[in-house]
Amino acid sequence: MTETPRRRVPDSPPGRRAVLKLTVGVALTLPVAHFVNAQDDNRRKARPQTNDRLVFAGGDRKGQLITLADLPAGGPPLTAYPMEPTANVVRDDSRLNQILLVRLDPNRLNGDTRARAADGIVAYSAVCTHTGCDVWDWQPASGTIKCPCHFSEFDLKESARVLNGPAPRRLPALPLKVVDGAPTVAGGFVGRPGFETGGG
């Protein structure tokens, strides 16, 4: 008995069922990927939340965790963004999340400021309440900070109250606590960050 040699059948194109399975698989994964990206976008835009860590907003250490050692007594202030601690998502998709951090003498802080401070470190919105400029002109002798655009001056020892200039209200404060040697958000902004529309 002689065997006839087997001939290889050429590959055939995928059948309808295989194409349908592939299409359904792709269709099911796309919304999940979009949902995950949308969640990250929402977390990046969200205002600071309790237990957020604080990271450098720029410079050589951008995105790195800020520790107590990074904040010497008397300043200078650091600009930070909050970072969601479980997924390490930096909330940097809104300028209104920029935070000023500075360590002051706790004995010079008023009661409200001291209650929101951690180890003398105070945190405020870094966005002026007048027209939304970045506030950064530090005055170490007085413990104040000025907006370079229209010269509003805020007293960081007294809940960032307005001392001079056209800003209509104080900089919103951000309560802090210390966790594992790092300043950490203890609650949401006290006041709305940003400026009032129509401010001149």
Which residues does each PLM region occupy?
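Acidic, glycine-rich flexible loop segments
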Residues: 129-136, 140-170
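Short Fe-S-cluster ligation motifs
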Residues: 154-195
